[in-house]
Regions:
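A short acidic, often aromatic-flanked loop/helix-cap motif at beta-alpha or helix-coil junctions
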Residues: 5-6, 92-96, 152-155
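Electropositive phosphate-/nucleotide-binding environments in soluble metabolic enzymes
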Residues: 6, 43, 170-174
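Structured loop/turn residues at beta-strand edges in well-structured enzyme cores
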Residues: 23, 101, 142
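Flexible, glycine-rich phosphate/dinucleotide-binding loops
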Residues: 36-37, 70-71, 133-134, 153
């Protein structure tokens, strides 16, 4: 990440070292958070893919979130069979951008952390509910990918009256898994 200040980069390096980050291991940031229910993919799905990253890729996983969003992380951790890296807390935005610049890949819900990961220049995979992925995924380079599902009502969505939120809850785990594998193979491994 060439755009972060030397101070922010030093902070990120010190933070990663303090939680046991190991050079040569796949570094993955995961953000299963959003304050909008139509952007929250189920915790058990994040847990399944997080376990896969740890077990089959030897990844070191860092859950990132903002103030008041810890409960999203705890919900995912409860469903996991493996331990992610220790919590890195809530750095400020510039420190978070520097931290993301140290990651190999980012995956998560459509949220601000994904935008920071894109700005940090790392490959991203976004999981989209109500908003159209094409509106929020940078055009061109394939290092930023997205997965979405349309149950037939995305264009005419009546949220908050919508009670099923199928557009995010039913995004297929296997489809996200395949997109994550392809992104890793194309840009990281």
């Amino acid at each position: 990440d060439k755009e972060s200040s030397k101070e922010d980069q030093a902070y990120a390096e010190k933070l990663l070292k303090s939680v046991g980050s190991q050079a040569g291991k796949l570094q993955v940031s995961v953000s299963p958070v959003s304050r909008q229910p139509y952007k929250v993919w189920p915790a058990q799905h994040f847990a399944k893919l997080s376990d896969w990253l740890i077990e089959s890729q030897g990844a070191q996983l860092y859950f990132l979130y903002g103030p008041g969003e810890e409960h999203f992380i705890e919900s995912v951790k409860k469903e996991m069979n493996n331990d992610p890296m220790p919590d890195v807390g809530i750095p400020d935005l510039l420190q978070t951008r520097a931290l993301l610049g140290k990651m190999d890949i980012h995956f998560g819900n459509d949220n601000g952390l994904r935008h920071l990961a894109i700005a940090a220049g790392i490959p991203t995979l976004g999981i989209f509910g109500k908003p159209s992925a094409v509106s929020w995924t940078p055009p061109g380079p394939t290092q930023h990918r997205s997965v979405e599902y349309d149950p037939g009502c995305k264009q005419s969505c009546t949220y908050p009256e919508c009670e099923h939120l199928s557009c995010i809850r039913d995004v297929p785990v296997d489809e996200v898994h395949q997109a994550l594998k392809k992104l890793l193979n194309d840009h990281v491994l």
